[in-house]
């Protein structure tokens, strides 16, 4: 079982694997999940009213328990940090891409991504995290 220390870094990996240019996993939909449970309201409003600064529980549960094989992780060559990433929409539909809700706090999981070559949107990472990535030879693209 692959465990990530930093949930937000795992979300960036999921973005690449599930919603990126060449998805390797079937995209997951919060709306479809809630609709299957009988929800028929406005998802954006429901999210804003009930989970203002939180990941929706269904998304948290799904993404936390999502198994990512070593083979999938070895295929990751880039990560994208952008407030408009689909994984964030699935986690928190009303999120406007601003704020610290999805900031990566730790790179302790980088050993899980042995072929990571570049990080897009690196300016959104803390300076120390940027320095750590550079020290590992990873190209940062703002």
Segments predicted by a language model, with ranges:
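N-terminal low-complexity, Pro/Thr/Ser-rich intrinsically disordered segments
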Residues: 1-2
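LRR N-terminal entry segment and analogous cap-like coil->beta motifs
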Residues: 5-10, 14, 18-124
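Leucine-rich solenoid repeat scaffolds
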Residues: 114-142
């Amino acid at each position: 079982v692959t465990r990530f220390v930093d949930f937000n870094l795992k979300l960036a990996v999921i973005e690449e694997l599930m919603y990126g240019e060449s998805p390797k996993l079937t995209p997951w939909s919060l709306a479809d999940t809630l609709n299957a449970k009988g929800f028929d309201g406005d998802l954006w409003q429901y999210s804003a009213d009930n989970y203002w600064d939180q990941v929706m529980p269904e998304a948290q549960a799904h993404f936390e328990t999502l198994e990512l094989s070593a083979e999938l992780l070895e295929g990751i060559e880039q990560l994208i940090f952008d407030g408009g990433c689909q994984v964030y929409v699935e986690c928190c539909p009303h999120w406007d891409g601003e704020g610290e809700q999805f900031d990566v706090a730790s790179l302790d999981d980088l050993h899980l991504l042995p072929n990571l070559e570049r990080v897009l949107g690196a300016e959104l990472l803390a300076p120390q995290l940027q320095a750590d990535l550079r020290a590992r030879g990873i190209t940062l693209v703002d």
